[in-house]
Every structure is written in structure tokens, then in C-alpha cells.
Amino acid sequence: MAMMTTTTTTFFHPLLPANTYKSGAVASSFVSVPRSSSLQFRSLVSDSTSICGPSKFTGKNRRVSVTVSAAATTEPLTVLVTGAGGRTGQIVYKKLKERSEQFVARGLVRTKESKEKINGEDEVFIGDIRDTASIAPAVEGIDALVILTSAVPQMKPGFDPSKGGRPEFFFDDGAYPEQVDWIGQKNQIDAAKAAGVKQIVLVGSMGGTNINHPLNSIGNANILVWKRKAEQYLADSGIPYTIIRAGGLQDKDGGIRELLVGKDDELLETETRTIARADVAEVCVQALQLEEAKFKALDLASKPEGTGTPTKDFKALFTQVTTKF
């Protein structure tokens, strides 16, 4: 930083020309600094030669230390939500869009129809998570990834609930849990790692500790087994992560229940095994902002509406979690 070497006897400080001092600030003609910066001037007495020579005020050499402290600016995080066309994914994407000072939201969907459904423009990409190349444009330049993709079973036609029994399910060709919940999620993790993302939030399901869980029998496809494998792959990736294993998802308003965290499916042994999609979405968004959420895996459910105290302190919520997987 260059300083003027002219001294003056008409100004209280021998290093600063009189016409550069205004109410404690330094004019930009003297020192070039950002408008948001602050300057602090400290007078030091020294026996060494000053750039300005002796001061007529003290007879001693004086120098000025200029400290430039630019105002801290935080750039919004660019966050990609995959599965943004799904019921929970839509909510996460919307929440990120609403907090534009903190996030730049991107979405990844499978079809043009899904893109139109969420009013997606240039920030919503169409891709197939089973094909790494097709998701590369969406991942490029992101800071964080929220994975909300999942295989979706279809009910076989002809089921009549009046006759009792249970419905049967199947998965479309190419859309089995192994292909979507394992290979598809692995592709996303690999692509994100290559792009240098700082965090991945993965939404899964409770029940993965029980190989005989009823969800594994749907379509005979072991959906929880493949989900668990993807979660382990993420935990081993070295990328800061938050794994959220949600209870039974409900299409209800969020923000009005006390949220509960657990581990190893212990919440499945209680009466509090469900959670609103909107609450899961909020936990995803909060995880992107809190260091306490990183390198943690948690089961997530809520107390019934009207009991307990609605959760507002998410830092405290994540602090309760001690498990990494």
C-alpha cells in the first residue's frame, strides 16, 4: 500500500495531509480501500527513520499503521436437490428458493413434466441418476448436494381392499432399488466428490438395521438393504455428510411438532414413528448451515401434534446426535 510522503504542520497527525481527513475517515485519494472496509490508525513512536521525517509536534519520528479490514461477505451456497420433483424434494427445493440470500437452488428431475411441475427454469436440470454423464451438468459448480431420489414401487392392478389381504407391488424395469437407491446414489456421490462439494445430505429411511423389515419384501427388492449400502458408501467417501433416516412420511404442515432424533431404529419401537415431509425438508436445509450436522447419521421422527414443544433450535437437535453411522 503506497502512502503520500508530504507532511503538514496544520493537521494534528504529521502523516496525513489536512485535506484527507474527514470525521475520522480517510479519503479515497489517500488510501484505496473497499467502501465496506474499516481503517484504524495507530501512532507508533520509533527511533528509526520515518517515511515522513521528524514530527514538529514531538520531535520524534512517527509512523502510521494502516489496518484494512474488509467487511466479511458470505456468498450463497449453490445447492443441488436431486429428486426435486418428488413430494419431499419439492419442499426442499422450495425452501432453498425462498432463502435466496443463503442459497442458490438447483434441482434435478427425471422428466420435462417434473421440471414444469416445480416451475423450473434454467436452474432445474433433467437427468438420469443411473447415467453419470447425464447428471454432470447439474453437479458442476455446486457447493452441496441433497439426495432425495428413491425407487418407487407400483401397486399391481386388481387389488380389492374389500376382500382383505395385502396389495402386491412391483418396480418398473430399470427402476429397482439396486439401480436407483444403490447405483444411482453412488453415481451422485461420485459426481459430487469429483466436483469438490463441501457437504452431502442424504435422506433415507428407518428400518435398515432389520433385514426382515416389511419394506424389504415389497417387490422382493430389498429396498432398505440398497439404501443402507449407499449410506455406508457416503459415510466412507470422506465428504462431510448428514444422513437423515426418516420415519413414515406424512403430507402435513411442518414446524408445529417436536422433532425426535434416534439411532439404530430405536424410534421404531415407540409410538413416534412418523414425521411430516415438511419437517424432513427443514432438517435438510438446517443441516446445510450447521457444523453440528456434519459427519452424522440420525433417525428422525416427531411427537404427535399438540404434544411437546415445536422444534426451533436445530443446533441443539443435531448436538443430540452422536452417531456417525
UniProtKB/Swiss-Prot annotation:
Family assignment from sequence similarity:
Belongs to the NAD(P)-dependent epimerase/dehydratase family.
In Gene Ontology terms, what is one molecular function of this protein?
copper ion binding
**SUPFAM superfamilies the UniProt entry points to:** NAD(P)-binding Rossmann-fold domains
**Entry keyword set:** Acetylation, Chloroplast, Plastid, Transit peptide
Ranges that cross the membrane: none
Listed name of the protein: Uncharacterized protein At2g37660, chloroplastic
Q: List the record's Gene Ontology CC terms alphabetically.
A: apoplast; chloroplast; chloroplast stroma; endoplasmic reticulum; thylakoid
Transit peptide limits:
1-69
List-wise, which residues carry N-acetylalanine?
Answer: 70
Q: Which Pfam families match?
A: NAD_binding_10
Whether Acetylation counts among this entry's keywords is yes
Source species: Arabidopsis thaliana
Question: Domain of life here?
Answer: Eukaryota
Q: Which residues form a coiled coil?
A: none
Where does this protein reside within or beyond the cell? Plastid, Chloroplast
InterPro entries (alphabetical):
NAD(P)-bd_dom (IPR016040), NAD(P)-bd_dom_sf (IPR036291), SARED1-like (IPR044163)
